């Protein structure tokens, strides 16, 4: 399993989420997953909403193009980003 997969123009990310971090950032690889730190707490879906907003901004897509496929209630998530307009350097390095 790879942390980042390009599939028919969409990006599939296997993520490990660190909630309540000091700032939002893509940290790097964490085993077979990409570690993402977010400032939101894991309460009442706030972390998922914040993650979607952060990823939408990072990939320059609308929030409606960011889909959490697996892991709604856990730290391990699988996320699909429909037709990303931009790919952050940390992630494009993993695609090569």
Swiss-Prot record:
SMART domains registered for this protein in UniProt: DUF167
Disulfide bridge map: none
GO CC annotation, single: cytoplasm
Tree of life domain: Bacteria
InterPro entries: DUF167, YggU-like_sf
SUPFAM superfamilies on file: YggU-like
Pfam family for this entry, one: DUF167
PANTHER family assigned to the protein according to its UniProt record, in alphabetical order: UPF0235 PROTEIN C15ORF40
Matches recorded under HAMAP family: UPF0235 (MF_00634)
Family to which this protein belongs: Belongs to the UPF0235 family.
Annotated protein name in UniProt: UPF0235 protein SO_3356
Species for this entry: Shewanella oneidensis (strain ATCC 700550 / JCM 31522 / CIP 106686 / LMG 19005 / NCIMB 14063 / MR-1)
């Amino acid at each position: 399993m790879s942390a980042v997969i390009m599939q028919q123009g969409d990006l599939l990310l296997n993520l490990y989420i660190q909630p309540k971090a000091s700032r939002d950032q893509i940290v790097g690889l964490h085993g077979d997953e990409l570690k993402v730190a977010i400032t939101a707490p894991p309460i009442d879906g706030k972390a998922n909403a914040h993650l979607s907003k952060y990823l939408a901004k990072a990939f320059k897509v609308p929030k409606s193009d960011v889909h959490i496929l697996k892991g709604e209630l856990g730290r391990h998530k699988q996320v699909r980003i429909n037709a990303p307009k931009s790919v952050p350097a940390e992630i494009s390095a993993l695609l090569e």
